[in-house]
Amino acid sequence: MATLVAPTTLDGLLGRVRALEPLIREHASRAERERRLAQPVSDALRDAGFFRIFRPASRGDGLELDPVTAFRVFEELSRIDSVVGWNVTLANACEVFGAWYSDHVTEEVFGSPKTVMAGSWNPPRKAVPADGGFRISGRTVFSSNCRSATWILGLANVFDDDKRCVSMTAERR
């Protein structure tokens, strides 16, 4: 399937959702059984742009949708299959954090239209300064869509001299 970037009107986006409905329904029981999106569905969602809903248009491939339009799309995907709606919504929630990335990290993470995010916020990991960066420790118990993701986003509490601040980390999968 070719990558689509237009149209980004609500009607156009809902048309894309409807076009994927037969494929999503065909693989719904498999997704439920395997507890993950079927690869053909994940690929079709990616190619249709549904993992780039909140990505900035300045990236060249981002849809940069407003929240009302985005959630209407999430709702329609969820109507077809809640597993699909959940995974697409959470993947896009991870993209929101890209607004705070440095230019270098933004280019590395979002430099490809095939980027798919997954993330886990709970429980947060612990990060302490180390040579060249941070040493992160902790355990992630759950992350929706991680098997389809090309990048994993995780929350880490940064500790330095008894002070704590919140930071996000991304890791290529």
Labelled PLM ranges:
Residues L20-A28:
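N-terminal capping segment at the start of a domain
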Residues M1-G15:
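Basic/polar N-terminal segments that are highly enriched at the extreme N-terminus
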